[in-house]
Amino acid sequence: MKNYHAPDEKGFFGEHGGLYVSETLIPALQELADAYKAAKNDPEFWAEFRCDLKHYVGRPSPVYHAARLSEHLGGAQIWLKREDLNHTGAHKVNNTIGQALLAKRMGKKRVIAETGAGQHGVASATVAARFGMTCDVYMGADDIQRQMPNVFRMKLLGANVVGVESGSRTLKDAMNEAMREWVARVDDTFYIIGTAAGPAPYPEMVRDFQCVIGNEAKAQMQEAIGRQPDVAVACVGGGSNAIGLFHPYIGEENVRLVGVEAGGLGVNTPDHAAPITSGAPIGVLHGFRSYLMQDENGQVLGTHSVSAGLDYPGIGPEHSHLHDIKRVEYTVAKDDEALEAFDLLCRFEGIIPALESSHAVAWAVKNAPKMGKDQVILVNLSGRGDKDINTVAKLKGIKL
């Protein structure tokens, strides 16, 4: 994998990705692609990006040896890449800082975003406040109900939260609505996509901004243990935290890469959000081609996950490509496994993880005991779980 290069000039990762949008959006995406290409080759752009990550986000985020959890499980040593310690509480802000700097460079005064768990909405509202832009966040009505703390947070930050009542009233529908709005106001509006999906150049751009995770982790693990981990694992919805960890490791052939999809109630039921593990066919959604949960007529299927942030029927195109070329293994953690991992991390390490990240922790919980004590698993702890305490309390029958 030493010579891995993707996407190609048309925005394809193998047979995934590309640009499947209405004519009206082509000029906007071309303008964005040109602006990003120029920014990518401008050292000053990256200097400003790094400066904000350091002084505003609080990077680098540490790697932490979860020694008590490792001892309890009795096997491999579990290390956590602590994205939960970033300003706003998750990895999302790495990307919103980058896109906001690009919006500023392009002279856009307004940003819009879609959000599922609310973390990307909060991160977008945060950077809009930071750079003096107006912000509208599109969010499915169901997600608004299960993520009230984040909805209030966005409003505190000055954003307008637009509830989406159409379809399944979740992330997919919020993304549809945001794209419609972008078509209508493309001149003054920048659309900050929150995951490594969407039409080109978004998957590449989001990956590049999130690669700070894996680049830091490589240097930090080398310093901490004198080598790289045996396995690097991350949860995958659209897949931005995972691609940020995986991409810098693609050339490290001794490092196994594992992406954990949302298994929901099981991939043998309709209630999950695991397109790759469930063997979903290729389809087109939100401007890109990738594995997509759909019925025999090509209608997008409903999804289920205990975590709002993984509740998405598609997956970023680069993940589909990495699956095709067998560089990354994709598997699932079910709701109950994620909840068990959530409890274990709380009790053994004093860290409340996001339910999304708990899916990656669940892989470590399941697999560490089968590995040697000298082996190392690096888990991307993509976010903190404050936003999820209502969901968890409800599932435990506790009224807050």
From Swiss-Prot:
Alphabetically sorted, this entry's keywords are:
Amino-acid biosynthesis, Aromatic amino acid biosynthesis, Lyase, Pyridoxal phosphate, Tryptophan biosynthesis
Write out the GO MF terms.
Answer: tryptophan synthase activity
InterPro entries, per this entry? Trp_synth_b_CS, Trp_synth_beta, Trp_synth_beta/beta-like, TrpB-like_PALP, TrpB-like_PALP_sf
Q: Tell me the cofactors it needs.
A: pyridoxal 5'-phosphate
Q: In which pathway does it act?
A: Amino-acid biosynthesis; L-tryptophan biosynthesis; L-tryptophan from chorismate: step 5/5
| E.C. number(s) listed in UniProt | 4.2.1.20
Q: What PROSITE patterns does this protein's entry cite?
A: TRP_SYNTHASE_BETA (PS00168)
Q: Which positions does the record annotate as the modified residue N6-(pyridoxal phosphate)lysine? A: 92
Q: Which GO terms describe its cellular component?
A: cytoplasm
Query: What broad class of enzyme is this?
Result: lyase
CDD domains xref list: Trp-synth_B
Q: Which SUPFAM superfamilies match?
A: Tryptophan synthase beta subunit-like PLP-dependent enzymes
Catalytic activity, per the record? (1S,2R)-1-C-(indol-3-yl)glycerol 3-phosphate + L-serine = D-glyceraldehyde 3-phosphate + L-tryptophan + H2O
Q: Does the keyword Lyase apply?
A: yes
Q: Name one Pfam family in it.
A: PALP
Summarizing the function annotation, the protein's role is:
The beta subunit is responsible for the synthesis of L-tryptophan from indole and L-serine.
Family, as annotated = Belongs to the TrpB family.
What is annotated about its quaternary structure and interactions? Answer: Tetramer of two alpha and two beta chains.
Q: What is this protein called?
A: Tryptophan synthase beta chain
Source organism? Neisseria meningitidis serogroup C (strain 053442)
